[in-house]
Each structure stands twice: as C-alpha cells, then as structure tokens.
C-alpha cells in the first residue's frame, strides 16, 4: 500500500502508470485499505497527462469486476462517463470496458446506461471510436441478452458508416452474432444496411458481405432472403474482383 501511494504521487508519469496496474492487482487483498486504493485510482483518472488517463481507462473494466457492486455504481460509473466525454484516444480505450460492464450489470436496470453508451459511441464524430464499438460488438451479446435487439439499428448504422474500416469490421462481426437477433429486426435494419453498401468500392467490404449472407438467410428464412437479396447475391457472384467472387464460392 505504501509503495502504491508513493509512486502514484510521483511527479513523473512512469510511477503513476505503474500505480494504475498495481491498484488492480492489490485491490482484492487490500481489506480496509480498499477505500484508499479507490481514491488513488480516482486521482489517476483525473490526471491531466494523457498517458496516465489512458492507462487508468485501460484498467477500468478489470477493476470493476473485482470491486463491490455498490462501489461500481455510482462511483466508478461516474468516471466511466468522464472517460467517454474525454479525448478520442481515451474514449477508444474506455469503450473496451463495456465488455466487463455489460456482464456485471446483466439482468439489472443499470444495463440501460450501457445501451445509451453504445448508441452514443455509434454516433461519435471520431471514426476510431465507432470502429472500436464495431470491433467489440460481438463480445457484448452475452451480457445484453434480449436487450441486444434494441441495438440492432445501431449495428445497422455501423454497417452503413462513412468510413470503410468501420463498415468492414461491423460486417465481419455480423456473421457471428446475427443468430441472436430478432428476425423482424434483421429484415428491417440489417438487410437494408447491407443493400446500401452492396456497391461499395472496397473489395474487402463486398467480401465481408459474402460471409454474412448464409447466416442472414438462416435468420430470415430462404423465402425472404430470395425476395430481398437474391439480386445482390447474383451481382456479387459476377463481381469483377476475384477476391469478392471467391467469397461466394
């Protein structure tokens, strides 16, 4: 405890960065010293040095998993909100903590906050934040449970994103998780999103669409699939790019 206190108050960033890691490692066995550790962590979260704040954000999710739930909400959640209104680099790192938070708040009213965070991140001005959300989206399924259907429109927006990297990552994850979605949501939100990027200029995006078609057909039924997506399937099978055609063989 004394070591963590000393290095967390050092002038140089190296000690403070190390303290972020050590607080998590020491917390479970800290007993009555836990409150002191939390206060040291909160101070690091408020540090003006970007590297220290990013390190604190990185430790946020794992630390929440070992903290008492009555501490996580509201104390830790307040800092999560601060992270998500900080610089792009901090938001990207903090966003990965959603993986832990949705599991922690599973089947509780607090899950509503996480839904709001996902929606806000999907509308963030920074494409890096939207890309990170698309990347972790498949890992949020278990924690959200049935509430994930509320976020199908959000995933549809990520598929239609203005940045190719975001579109591609969103499509890559879709094939893994579409079976968890309500069929009606897939028809209303996912299929139109895919059709809107069918003529994408990037071969990677078109190839990723190919990986989704089978799962989509199984989700909505082959009759609906043939009605809505048969033309798309045929056009991609004849695409001039060999990489795209290969994905449909």
What kind of region is each of these model predictions?
Residues 11-12, 48-49, 86-88, 125-126, ...:
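Short inter-helical turns and helix N-cap capping residues of alpha-solenoid HEAT/ARM repeat scaffolds
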Residues 25-30, 63-70, 101-108, 139-144, ...:
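Residue-level signature of the C-terminal ends
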Residues 6-8, 12, 18-26, 43-45, ...:
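Alpha-solenoid helical-repeat scaffolds
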Residues 1-7, 32-45, 70-84, 108-122, ...:
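HEAT/HEAT-like alpha-solenoid repeats
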Residues 5, 26-28, 84, 236-241, ...:
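Short, intrinsically disordered, charge-balanced linker/junction segments flanking boundaries
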Residues 17-25, 58-62, 78, 96-100, ...:
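Residue-level signature of alpha-solenoid helical repeat scaffolds
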């Amino acid at each position: 405890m004394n070591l963590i206190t000393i290095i967390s108050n050092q002038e140089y960033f190296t000690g403070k960065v190390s303290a972020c890691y050590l607080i998590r490692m020491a917390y479970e066995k800290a007993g009555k010293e836990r409150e002191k550790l939390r206060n040291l962590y909160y101070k690091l979260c408020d540090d003006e040095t970007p590297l220290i704040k990013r390190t604190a954000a990185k430790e946020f999710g794992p630390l929440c998993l070992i903290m008492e739930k009555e501490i996580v909400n509201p104390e830790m959640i307040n800092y999560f909100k601060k992270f998500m209104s900080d610089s792009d680099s901090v938001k990207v790192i903090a966003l990965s903590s959603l993986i832990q938070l949705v599991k922690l708040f599973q089947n509780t009213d607090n899950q509503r906050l996480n839904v709001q965070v996902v929606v806000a991140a999907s509308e963030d001005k920074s494409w890096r934040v939207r890309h990170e959300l698309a990347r972790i989206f498949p890992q949020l399924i278990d924690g959200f449970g049935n509430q994930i259907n509320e976020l199908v429109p959000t995933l549809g927006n990520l598929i239609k994103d203005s940045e190719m990297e975001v579109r591609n990552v969103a499509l890559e994850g879709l094939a893994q998780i579409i079976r968890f979605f309500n069929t009606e949501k897939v028809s209303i939100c996912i299929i139109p999103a895919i059709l809107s990027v069918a003529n994408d200029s990037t071969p990677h995006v078109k190839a990723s669409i190919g990986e989704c078609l089978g799962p989509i057909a199984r989700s909505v039924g082959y009759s609906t699939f043939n009605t809505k997506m048969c033309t798309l399937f045929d056009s991609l099978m004849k695409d001039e790019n060999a990489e795209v055609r290969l994905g449909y063989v």
